[in-house]
Design a protein with these regions (language model features):
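A charged N-terminal "starter" segment
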Residues: 1-112, 119-132, 175, 179, ...
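Conserved anion-binding
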Residues: 116-179
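Active-site-proximal beta-alpha loop/turn segments in soluble metabolic enzymes
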Residues: 60, 142-158, 182-197, 221-239, ...
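Non-membrane alpha-helical structural segments and their capping/turn regions in soluble enzymes
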Residues: 29, 33, 100, 118, ...
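Active-site beta-loop-alpha junctions enriched in small/polar residues
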Residues: 30, 52-56, 73-76, 96-98, ...
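Structured core elements
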Residues: 69, 92, 114, 135-137, ...
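Structured alpha-helical segments in the cores of large, soluble enzyme domains
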Residues: 35, 81, 163-178, 204-215, ...
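C-terminal active-site-proximal or functional interface alpha/beta core segments in diverse enzymes
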Residues: 196-267
Length: 267
């Protein structure tokens, strides 16, 4: 039987199945690298790969070798990142409604925390967390889900805190001895419109300015989480990354992005 099915540089899937047996998952690391470098080259950002997209250790090790950091949302994902060789300082830990046990795991691991609420930050302080570099996730009031009914920003969203709560969180971090500050926003999910990301960048920078003015701190790390999409249906456009070459210029400090499916979805 002949089936014209290949992957990567013409490698036959039939031959791979004959060699390794089935069921078999095959990843094209060349495609992973192309996707990774396209984001880095066009945005000027540091990539923290979102482990929730695919936590395969071989993929994680490969992305680490390219220079990526890791975005983790649970102790399990922190564990995978550490197993793959990521340094704790290159792991961003963002979770909604983290339990004491989940927070304690992150503290012991020494990862960078991105707190979703002032309550979570206060809980961590009570468990012995000592902030040095600390991120807070801010709800910009604007965000797109991958399908109708998925809310990523605004009153009904679980992601992040509104500006007044964020101001109080940064004030508390300053009081507790933090020396570096980051700000994070959930951009959306599977967005294919490049102009949308520029709008989010502007909103994030404006939120940072307000916080800096009110609290008297300097935000030096800007994290745009999620968002970068890939087409799933015939006729859907690809995300035009060339329009994002000015993205880095919106921010006076380090820009971080947290792609997942864009890196591995078509690999």
């Amino acid at each position: 039987m002949s089936i014209g099915c290949s992957v990567g540089g013409g490698v036959s899937l039939i031959e791979l199945a004959d060699t390794y047996g089935t069921p078999l998952l095959v990843y094209d690391l060349n495609r992973v690298e192309v996707n990774y470098r396209a984001l880095v080259d066009n945005t000027g950002a540091r990539v923290y790969y979102s482990i929730k997209a695919n936590g395969n250790l071989a993929l994680l090790r490969f992305l680490r070798s390219l220079g990526a950091g890791a975005d983790a949302s649970s102790p399990g994902e922190i564990y995978l990142a550490l197993r793959a060789g990521f340094r704790p300082g290159d792991i961003m830990y963002t979770g909604s409604f983290l339990s004491n046990t989940e927070i304690e795991y992150g503290i012991r691991a020494g990862v960078t925390f991105n707190f979703d609420s002032i309550r979570a930050f206060e809980k961590a302080l009570g468990l012995g967390y000592e902030p040095r570099l600390v991120f807070f996730r801010v709800d910009l009031g604007y965000g797109r889900g991958f399908t109708h009914g998925v809310t990523l920003a605004g009153e009904d969203s679980k992601f992040g805190m509104f500006i007044n709560d964020a101001i109080e969180a940064y004030r508390l971090a300053k009081l507790k001895g933090a020396v570096e500050y980051g700000i994070h926003a959930m951009m959306g999910s599977n967005v294919l419109d490049a102009d949308y990301f520029l709008k989010i960048a502007n909103l994030l920078r404006e939120s940072a300015r307000v916080i800096e003015d009110k609290v008297g701190v300097k935000i030096t790390h800007y994290d745009m989480g999620g968002g970068f999409g890939i087409p799933y249906k015939p006729g859907e456009p690809e995300l035009d990354l060339s329009k994002l070459r000015g993205l880095r210029g919106y921010f006076p400090g380090e820009l971080i992005i947290e792609p997942g499916r864009f890196i591995v979805g078509n690999a």
